[in-house]
Amino acid sequence: MGKRFPSGWFSPRVHPPRRQRSPMTNQATPGTASVWNNIEGIGFGGDYNPEQWPVSVRLEDLELMQEAGVNFLSVGIFSWALLEPAEGQYDFGWLDDVMDNLHGIGVKVALATATAAPPAWLVRKHPEILPVTADGTTLGPGSRRHYTPSSAVYRKYAAGITRVLAERYKDHPALALWHVDNELGCHVSEFYGEEDAAAFRLWLERRYGTIDALNAAWGTAFWSQHYGSFEEILPPGVAPSTLNPGQQLDFQRFNSWALMDYYRSLVAVLREVTPAVPCTTNLMASSATKSMDYFSWAKDLDVIANDHYLVAADPERHIELAFSADLTRGIAGGDPWILMEHSTSAVNWQPRNQPKMPGEMLRNSLAHVARGADAVMFFQWRQSFAGSEKFHSAMVPHGGRDTRVWREVVDLGAALQLLAPVRGSRVESRAAIVFDYEAWWASEIDSKPSIDVRYLDLLRAFHRSLFLRGVSVDMVHPSASLDGYDLVLVCTLYSVTDEAAANIAAAAAGGATVLVSYFSGITDEKDHVRLGGYPGAFRELLGVRVEEFHPLLAGSQLKLSDGTVSSIWSEHVHLDGAEAFQTFTGYPLEGVPSLTRRAVGTGAAWYLATFPDRDGIESLVDRLLAESGVSPVAEADAGVELTRRRSADGGSFLFAINHTRAAASVRASGTDVLSGERFTGTVEAGSVAVIAED
């Protein structure tokens, strides 16, 4: 337990932080620009795993790649056991051939460090690298991601194979990007082993400096949890009752940090050997992944890359896709990003793995491009015949060429070639939704007023409403610049720093319409309640004081004064400078404000004290859009997804994606890039138009 890590174990930042940008900036960071300098047009391809196939199939792959228009592939992600079959013994013959052959057909490569699954010989020699769960269970090999990022031994071996790969391929003309590890935090995102505990203690000591500062931050006077030294602290594992919330929150921060510090340790090797080659890892930004603070990770990635998979059972899965893509663009600070993985059709890991409908793959792919992706990639190139993912769809299905999926892959490749002029353009938004992983973590730690308050629910309800109206929206960190946004939505931002709260208040004072919801501003970054009445950090901005929470029982609803209903949450709101626009009805909150507004500077601050039903959300969004002056990207029939990308030279591209089974009208003028003809104003059922606007 008392183990100390050697100097240098905490790897330094290897390049400067990413520059924060205002919404309208069209300037790429140097690292991002260098990625696209290596790839012509929109990147198109997927994970390529040639080690699973004989040479004859690999040669056929080259023909099929050219037929489909592939120009970008990730290679070697899970190949460590073949590249280094025994410690210090390497076999690069197959990879040499693959790199040379791909270069021969003009394909650029995101070469992986191959570290996402340690080989069997390494696990046998060093079982201490295996991850340990909260109940003390050691997770064994036979799958993937079976290591802990805090293992000094694993870091040494991972850095070793990374260095050998970098030295061998540093001058290869196919190398465009380093794909560092893979889906960090997937399957296992919390680590409880002895080495993890030691790393956690060291992280805490560096964060707080003294044990007294930690005791104050964690409120350890409660339940006799006081610590006399950092050596007494363990990760928050299985315990008789609820655990210290400050300890839980810091453990979330630590695990997110540990995964990224492991990434940085490999990038340090790559920077040393190949300083001109950009580096990234594939995130999993979506409504399903909360364990990693991707906004804090972004500064260490030269280009943001993301994996996204639909939930087949979700009837509005295209809206969740838009949410994920908008979040990814926000993490990227507005830069173009890479869709590193999605599926051509069914996945293999959901309870019922339905295929995508005809045309859905094209709509999905172009929806990501519409929202900022400059590369569209899949898992994987060729569908495996063995292994856990053999029923996961791929670009080349088990049935080969004579399949719907392959024909749609070829059609998509042709469409992306036509969209080359879109590359480098950016999505412009005048509306923003504030998004913070730490607030997500803190709000869902146990012992809150209601288990029904989930961080994403209200946030996604507002995003959905804006999506349906064709209003473009950015996801922004609470500390990021809000200049240029006319509408800012702050949903269940339970914990917030003083600086972030001031940033949001400044947006209202500067002319923005700001909406803050219930259960926002309640605690500071230590999860200490801000005393004096809720909503704490936003009380003065909003001109309200909440005396007491009134969470609703499961299934209960409240009628509001405008005739709509709400659920989940209510509270006793007092006006303190604000004006009531809506009230609760019925005992015990009859006449108590449920929606308020306060004029602030040249803007306004609204407060929402409940979770409205869909009619209530729609009515409120209409009111906010009217006040802020934010308008839809264009006018179109219902069911058409609208997004605009604008290039630095002023050119604009309107993406109109028809998610319905009937032709739809879109009011726009220009040339449809996909057809090469003047846009007629109609998008056929299930089709996409990309209009280079006049």
UniProtKB/Swiss-Prot annotation:
Keyword Hydrolase: yes
CDD domains in the cross-refs: A4_beta-galactosidase_middle_domain
Manganese recorded as keyword: no
Residues binding substrate: 144, 182, 349, 389-392
Compositionally biased tracts (Polar residues): 22-31
InterPro entries: Beta_galactosidase_C (IPR013739), Beta_galactosidase_Trimer (IPR013738), Class_I_gatase-like (IPR029062), Glyco_hydro_42 (IPR003476), Glyco_hydro_42_N (IPR013529), Glyco_hydro_b (IPR013780), Glycoside_hydrolase_SF (IPR017853)
Superkingdom: Bacteria
Major enzyme class: hydrolase
Family to which the UniProt record says this protein belongs: Belongs to the glycosyl hydrolase 42 family.
Primary role: Hydrolyzes p-nitrophenyl-beta-D-galactopyranoside (PNPG), o-nitrophenyl-beta-D-galactopyranoside (ONPG) and chromogen 5-bromo-4-chloro-3-indolyl-beta-D-galactopyranoside (X-gal), with highest activity against PNPG. Also acts on p-nitrophenyl-beta-D-glucopyranoside (PNPGlu) and o-nitrophenyl-beta-D-glucopyranoside (ONPGlu), but with significantly lower activity.
Protein name: Beta-galactosidase
